[in-house]
Amino acid sequence: MSDLKPKQVFEETIFSQQDKPELTAQQQFDQQQTFIPTTIEETEPELEDALEQVIRPSGRRKWLAGGLFAAFAGLVGWQAVDSVLSAMQNGDWLTLGWSGFISVLAGLGLGAMGKELWKLRQLRHLFSVQEQGEKLLQSDSVGQGKAFCQQVAKQSGVAEENPAYDRWKNSVNTAHSDAEILQMYDAMVVTQQDKQATKVISRFATESAALVAISPLAIADMLLVAWRNFKMIDTLSTIYGIELGYASRIRLLRLVLANMAVAGASELVIDAGMDLMSMDLAGKLSARAGQGVGVGILTARLGLKAMALLRPIPWQAETQVKLSAIRKEIVSKVASITLKP
């Protein structure tokens, strides 16, 4: 008896080579039937318009704040005078003493509020100067640029004997337009302030990165970074000749953060990742050091945005300070103190 199995007949249809679909064959699509056109909403201009309203608010808010302060000061003064006169008429010397003491405290408080409002007014004036500078840069006018730059130099605390300022004055002639005069002032005078500001930003950014990299407490990181950021903004404002009060610092920090939100935070992650990959540090830096690098880059970006808001003349493409140089310095600093052996 044979061990061979009986035959099996398969009745399935065998596809020939001609029946197989050709993968590289051309296919025609009807655009109206196959694809549904959709409109992409552009949110970036809306965000920029919102930021413009935050940075340069309408004049109604200015008058409202001044009116409220004047009304409050008048009511406080009226109440103080009325209390003192009533106590003197009634012979209530204890009430008179308390009224005088409270009046002195109220006067000190009103003085501090008035000083803060004055400094906030100076910050608003800076934004109006920037707006005027933008108009002059975009116009073909003649005869206003030199006076505008001289006023900016006076407000910024640039001395007459400053070599850069003196060189700019000797370079200006009647053949230059207002836009050319502003560009020359930016390249000769404001650039010197930018160099000082860049050194300050680099120092504060590397210090913040190093503090976060070696700090064991998260709450300490937050306090240190906040303190360093406020100190950095205060130093930058001094370089550009602007005296900031407490309210002005808060306002400027809010404007800087709003500006950063418009620009987007994804660039920070991409740039930091590229630096880590290029320097072969991704596998050597600890998680804590990575946080330090991120905080340092964020501080540097914060400082650059503060520079953009504090400069009397808007950035020019060829003179704008880039984040790349400061970023490399931050990564190198953190790597030098936290690299694993």
Curated annotation (Swiss-Prot):
Q: How does it sit in the membrane?
A: Multi-pass membrane protein
Q: Which residues cross the membrane?
A: 64-84, 93-113, 207-227, 255-275
As for subcellular location, the record says: Cell inner membrane
Q: Which residues form the signal peptide?
A: none
Q: Which UniProt keywords apply?
A: Cell inner membrane, Cell membrane, Membrane, Transmembrane, Transmembrane helix
- Which Pfam family is one of those matched by this entry? DUF697
GO CC, sorted alphabetically, is: plasma membrane
Entry's NCBIfam families?
A: hyp_HI0043
| Similarity comment | Belongs to the UPF0283 family.
Can you name this protein?
UPF0283 membrane protein VV2076
The species is: Vibrio vulnificus (strain YJ016)
